[in-house]
A protein has these predicted regions:
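Activation targets extended, charge/polar-rich intrinsically disordered C-terminal tails
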Residues: 20-24, 153-209
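Glycine-rich catalytic cores of cysteine/serine-nucleophile enzymes that process amide/ester linkages
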Residues: 58-123, 151-159, 163
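N-terminal accessory segments that precede or flank the first globular/catalytic domain
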Residues: 20-85
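A structural motif
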Residues: 111-120, 127-149
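Sec-dependent signal peptide recognition
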Residues: 3-11
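Soluble non-cytosolic domains of exported or imported proteins
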Residues: 48, 74, 128-135, 159-164
Length: 209
C-alpha cells in the first residue's frame, strides 16, 4: 500500500463521499433520462470513433480535491473511453459507488458524462493508431466492464484488481499498445497518474479542444 496516498487522497475521498446521500436507483435513472433529453450537442458528435478518450474538469468536491493534488497545467479530474452504439455514444469509466449506485467500471451516456462539466473544460483525444487498433482499446474497456472491476478506493496503482478513473485508462492503453503513456507525480511515497499525459499530441490527436 502507498502510505502517503492512503491518508491523503484516499482518506479525504472517503470523508467527502460519506457526506453524500446514498443514491436512489430509480431517482438516479429518472434524473439521467431528464438530463439526456435536455442536453443539446455543442459540437459534431458524429466525428467520434470507438476508443476515443474523453477527459473533463468536474465541479464536485472530489474533482476539486483531485485537481488540487495533481496540480497540472490543464486542470482535469475524470476520464473515460468512448464507445459507439448505433447512432449514440457511451462512455466506459470507473467511479465510486457513492455517486451512481454502481461500483467501479461502468457505462453511461456521453451527454450525461459531460453534464457536470463545461465544454471548454472538456477534451476528447484519439490515439494516433489505425481504427482497427482503437477498436481493440474499446474491446479492452468492455472487458473491464463485463468483469465488473471495482473502484480503487486506495488509489494504489500497483493493484491491478481494481481501478480509479485514470488507472482504468492506463491499463486499457497498456494492454492494447504495450506502452506506458501516463507520466507520474510523486506524492510522498506514492505516485499519481497525470491526466495531462493524454493531451500529448505526439501520441494523441485532439478531437475536442
Amino acid at each position: 500500500m502507498q502510505p502517503f496516498i492512503k491518508p491523503t487522497i484516499a482518506f479525504l475521498f472517503f470523508v467527502l463521499i460519506s457526506c453524500q446521500p446514498k443514491p436512489d436507483k430509480k431517482v438516479f435513472d429518472q434524473v439521467n433520462l431528464k438530463i439526456q433529453s435536455i442536453i443539446k450537442p455543442k459540437f459534431d458528435y458524429s466525428i467520434l470513433e470507438d476508443g476515443d478518450i474523453v477527459l473533463k474538469r468536474g465541479t464536485g468536491q472530489v474533482s476539486i480535491l483531485m485537481i488540487k493534488y495533481l496540480d497540472e497545467k490543464i486542470p482535469l479530474s475524470h476520464c473515460g473511453i468512448i464507445v459507439k452504439e448505433d447512432t449514440s455514444y457511451s462512455v466506459i469509466h470507473s467511479i465510486a459507488k457513492e455517486y451512481t449506485g454502481i461500483d467501479g467500471v461502468q457505462k453511461t451516456t456521453l451527454s450525461y458524462f459531460l453534464s457536470d462539466a463545461k465544454l471548454k473544460d472538456s477534451y476528447i483525444v484519439r490515439h494516433r493508431s489505425p481504427i482497427s487498433k482503437r477498436k481493440i482499446l474499446k474491446t479492452k474497456a468492455l472487458g473491464f466492464l463485463n468483469n465488473k472491476i471495482p473502484f480503487d478506493y486506495d488509489f494504489d496503482i500497483r493493484d491491478t484488481s481494481k481501478f480509479y478513473c485514470s488507472e482504468f485508462i492506463d491499463h486499457a492503453l497498456k494492454s492494447t499498445y504495450k506502452k506506458e503513456y501516463f507520466s507520474r507525480k510523486k506524492i510522498g511515497h506514492g505516485e499519481a497518474l497525470l491526466l495531462n499525459s493524454l493531451l500529448d499530441t505526439t501520441y494523441f490527436e485532439r478531437i475536442l479542444n
